[in-house]
């Protein structure tokens, strides 16, 4: 967790609350598998908290809230069935690591 003797203290009370919220969400995030809806919703909350201005944060929160309201509590721990196009998701890192490195890919060379 955050150690106030080793790290700088936030300049405002709002910054302090955001820092505590991020630390709490990091602990909650560990309880969800990376391929679940709950994990995605927690990642969305990170983006809401870390938004730089009010308009951006409000927009992100409305998107988060509509996704949360459209799902039941039992769906939060179930794997997401729709594919995501993001190359940075933990779900995609798993598939990249599954590829064996010693396999060379064939190239088609035309005869001259």
UniProtKB/Swiss-Prot annotation:
Described purpose of this protein according to its UniProt entry: Through its interaction with host SGS3, acts as a suppressor of RNA-mediated gene silencing, also known as post-transcriptional gene silencing (PTGS), a mechanism of plant viral defense that limits the accumulation of viral RNAs.
Family in the record: Belongs to the geminiviridae protein AV2/V2 family.
Q: Which GO terms describe its cellular component?
A: host cell perinuclear region of cytoplasm
Q: Which GO terms describe its biological process?
A: negative regulation of gene silencing by regulatory ncRNA; symbiont-mediated suppression of host innate immune response
Keyword field: Host cytoplasm, Host-virus interaction, Inhibition of host innate immune response by virus, Suppressor of RNA silencing, Viral immunoevasion
Question: What is the official name of this protein in its record?
Answer: Protein AV2
Among the Pfam families in the record, one is WCCH
InterPro entries from the entry?
A: Gemini_V2, WCCH
Localization, UniProt = Host cytoplasm, Host perinuclear region
Q: How does it assemble?
A: Interacts with host SGS3.
